[in-house]
Amino acid sequence: MKFLQSFPVILAVFSFAANLVSSKLVYEYETKYVTVEIVTIVSGETTYTTERLETNGPTSTTTTIVIPSSKPSSPESKPKSDSQPMFQSPSPVQITPSTTSINNAPSPTKPETTVTASPAVIAHTSVFVVTPNSAPTTSSSPPNIVQQVKAAITPSAPKPQPQPQPQENNSGTNDDSQLSSFSRQILEAHNIKRASHGVNPLTWSNELYNYANKVASSYDCSGNLRHTSGPYGENLALGYSSGANAVSAWYSEGFNFGGAGKLNHFTQVVWKSTTQLGCAYKDCRAKGWGLYIICNYQKPGNIIGQELANILPLIRS
């Protein structure tokens, strides 16, 4: 924004010329008529003021001749030059920017995250039993777990009688004499139970043993049992002092021949179509458990729809 003010001012500008003509001083006076304009400029919060000269009248010249007495006297003052306009630099103006204070701005809210745990899905293809011989010394309570694929049956097995601990190494490998002792014991225990039902005895399979031994070697003695879901029939046990005691616990589950019998550890032990056996173990007594025992069967038993042909009743006690 501009504000313009103008008023006439007579500015006398003298041009001095001193010439010596016939021992005389000649003075010439020049008069100019100008107009002074004061311009005010407002820009935002800053104001500027300037002055501008403009010539708006005729110029007159007056000549005066003076005869000096002895020495020419110097003029009292030197005339001002009229070539430069008058201009006043604007004074600096400090502008303080306005600020806005926000005191009640809401703090950002951290989004809440809800995590919903999905239930674990565990698939079992065979059955297994965990029944300890005695309460582990390092566990708060002894395990008493029975799980299987087709049915869950709580066995009423009698407490196994204390027997000498097997001397085999943890996985049942490397020492043939110890391995054969364990394999003979558990194979014999199977065949005694099978003979009571009039089915053929099982034979030992190195292929099944190697499979079972691989699983036993990797067991962590945690007290949790999980089936391998392999191509063979499978029974698991934990907490027993020998393979024979584990077989007795499996067999004690029994089968209801007069009604809707359920497939379990017993039915796999006496399954008629099964012909081969391979078992291995790991010693978990150092962690408060007994032996971890795994037995694999070929052909696998517990096949739904084949119960009548493969589960025969007891013929002798």
From Swiss-Prot:
Phenotype of gene-disrupted mutants = reduces capacity to damage oral epithelial cells.
Compositional bias of type Polar residues: which residue ranges?
84-116, 168-179
- Protein's UniProt name: Probable pathogenesis-related protein CaO19.6200
Extract the signal peptide range. 1-23
Homology family: Belongs to the CRISP family.
One Pfam match, by short name? CAP
For this UniProt record, the keywords arranged alphabetically read as follows: Glycoprotein, Secreted, Signal, Virulence
Q: Where in the cell is it found?
A: Secreted
Gene3D superfamilies of this UniProt entry?
A: CAP (3.40.33.10)
Described by its record, this protein's role is as follows: Secreted protein that acts as a virulence factor during infections.
Stretches with biased composition (Low complexity): 58-76
The residue ranges of the SCP domain are 187-297
Its induction, per UniProt?
Answer: Induced in hyphae and up-regulated during oral infection. Expression is higher in white cells.
